[in-house]
Every structure is written in structure tokens, then in C-alpha cells.
Regions:
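Charged helix-capping and loop-helix junction motifs
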Residues: 110-114, 170-176, 202-208
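Catalytic grooves of carbohydrate-active enzymes
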Residues: 180-229
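His/Asp/Glu-enriched short active-site or ligand-binding loop at hydrolase and phosphoryl-transfer sites
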Residues: 140, 146-181, 220-231
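N-terminal signal-anchor transmembrane alpha helix of single-pass membrane proteins
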Residues: 2-18
Length: 233
């Protein structure tokens, strides 16, 4: 009985505590966006060779800034796109290197993946920052990675609205627009990796256009994660 309780306690510590942290962080992020009447567009898993430039063009047309959580393995050969993201004033953050689920691999492999993702961004930009705001793949962290990020004071960034672009049954492309308008602010999640299905890429583009149009119409501020959270100030 005591062994079983001990095992359950370890499991709770390993994944339960980070899960609770994630839920609280998500709510605080949503509250901050609503308080500031802000729309924060974030994109995971890029850069894509075609979809990311398309998104950058839309953002440039609207003179809006967004946040890109880059996946290290997708950077090689697309360094010019990473530089373009930075040159246009968007936030560059990390989504790790291999999109590892923090609960399904060893803690040390997950931790190594975080560091490898940062290194890939630095290599593309020719910088030595060594750390960037981090979004856990699938929103999952283990206690080792959580403590490491907290000790190093690395912002851990979640989201409040999922665009649904990776769902098996995609919702209406107005999902982000409608939910963000109803809430009065949001941190949206979409994905800018290249798709085989052009309809999915079109869905992302339409979602971004609609959200930016709504923000302009309602006087909602379009901010980056750094601006929302006052990172680096």
C-alpha cells in the first residue's frame, strides 16, 4: 500500500505539478490578454517554406507583429525565413527541436531537446542568446524541465485559443476571431509548418486575415508575447 502511494506521489510530482502549473499559467495569460484588450497571434512548428512567408506577408500588410515558436528540426535550409521573421520585428521563441512530448520521453532527453532547439535558433540568427521563451510541445512539461526553465527564468508560454488547424475535423476559420472578440482578448495558437493539403494552409491564412480584421475593427491591440508579458523590459 505504501509503495503504491509512493508511486502515485512520484507520478503526481513528475507530471501533475507541471500540469497544474500549465493550467494556472494559461489562465493568467488569458487574463493578461483580456485586461490589455490584446490579440496575440502565435505560430508553432515552423518555419514552413511557403506558409510562414505567406503569414509574414499578411502581417506586413496589416503592420502587425506576431510570435513564432520555431521547431529546431525545421530550421535547417530555412535560415533566411528565420532572419526575415526577426527583421520584420516579430518575436522568435522556441518549441524545442524534435517536438517531444515531455511526459513520454526521459526527462533528460526532453531537457536536451529544449537546449537543442535554442541552439538551432542561435545558429540561424548568428546569435548567442542561448535561451528563448519556450512553448512545450503538446503543452506538456515534466517536473525536471519545469524546474530548469523556472530556475533559468525562461518564460513558459501557453495559449488561450486553439485555431483548430491541426484537428482531425477543422472548425470554421473564424473560430479565433469569434472567440477572441467574445472574450475581449486572446493568445491564439496556429501552426505554420508546410502542409500537403492546401486547404489546411488556406485555413490558416484565412484565420489570420479574419483575426487581424476583427482586431482592427474592434480597436483591439495586436501584440507579441514579449509585449504582452513585458519580457525584456
Amino acid at each position: 500500500m505504501l509503495i503504491a502511494i509512493g508511486i502515485l506521489g512520484l507520478i503526481f510530482l513528475y507530471v501533475g505539478v507541471p500540469w497544474i502549473y500549465g493550467q494556472l499559467a494559461r489562465r493568467l495569460l488569458e487574463r493578461r490578454a483580456i485586461e490589455r484588450e490584446a490579440l496575440v497571434l502565435t505560430f508553432d512548428d515552423g518555419p514552413g517554406s511557403s506558409l510562414t512567408p505567406a503569414i509574414l506577408n499578411i502581417l506586413a500588410e496589416s503592420k502587425a507583429k506576431a510570435t513564432f515558436f520555431l521547431l529546431g528540426r525545421n530550421i535547417a535550409g530555412r535560415e533566411a525565413i528565420v532572419s526575415q521573421i526577426a527583421e520584420q520585428g516579430h518575436d522568435i521563441c522556441s518549441h524545442g527541436y524534435d517536438h517531444l512530448h515531455g511526459w513520454k520521453v526521459s526527462p533528460f532527453r526532453a531537457l536536451s531537446d529544449i537546449k537543442r532547439g535554442w541552439a538551432a535558433i542561435d545558429a540561424a540568427l548568428g546569435t548567442m542568446r542561448k535561451k528563448y521563451p519556450f512553448r512545450p510541445p503538446n503543452g506538456k512539461l515534466n517536473i525536471i524541465c519545469l524546474l530548469y526553465l523556472l530556475v533559468r527564468q525562461v518564460p513558459i508560454v501557453y495559449w488561450s485559443i486553439d485555431s483548430g488547424d491541426t484537428w482531425r475535423r477543422r472548425p470554421d476559420s473564424l473560430r479565433v476571431t469569434q472567440l477572441a472578440e467574445r472574450a475581449g482578448g486572446a493568445v491564439s495558437l496556429a501552426h505554420d509548418f508546410d502542409r500537403k493539403n492546401e486547404n489546411t494552409s488556406r485555413f490558416v491564412v484565412e484565420s489570420v486575415r479574419a483575426a487581424l480584421a476583427m482586431a482592427a475593427d474592434k480597436g483591439m491591440r495586436v501584440l507579441t508575447v514579449s509585449e504582452l508579458l513585458d519580457i525584456g523590459r
